[in-house]
Amino acid sequence: MPAGNQTRTNAKPQIHTGNIPKITPHLWFDKEAKEAAKFYTSIFPNSKITNTTTIHDTPSGDCDVVSFELSGQPFMAISAGPLFKFNESISFMVSCDTQEEIDYYWQKLSAVPEAEQCGWLKDKYGLSWQIVPAIMDEIMKDKDEKKIARVTEAFLKMKKLDIAELKKAYSGAGKR
């Protein structure tokens, strides 16, 4: 992280109890770390911004570092200039129990229609997300290769995943 003078806001003494996650996703933004953290925490339940620090006088100017949680999962974000961009090689998977939940996250997050495919979308910051039904994990573990092939054929044609259509493909309904 760049050296510089620090200003802390919302800072509270942290007592390390050993419950700190081993891995925390860290997102690099040009200038939008605070804005993005507010956006994401407004969408997911059990979410909050836990700390914001501004480091002054860095080579990129002022640098914001934001700690936040999405559905209890810790994240960090940094505003450190336009050196790096998000791409599809990294995405966050959101497991959804209902079609309504899939529809909700899709509507809130999707900002690049041409990037929508097979349950994947891209948000207004360029970050990729996979919005998937929770049942997909069990479906894809099935040992019946014909079922897996039907489900795969179905979801490859979809943008936003449709639970009813995936279940229909899994059961073979409509197939001769």
Predicted regions located by residue number:
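Basic/polar N-terminal segments that are highly enriched at the extreme N-terminus
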Residues: 1-21, 167-176
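C-terminal cap/linker of serine protease catalytic domains
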Residues: 18, 146-176
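Core segments of cupin and vicinal oxygen chelate
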Residues: 27-72
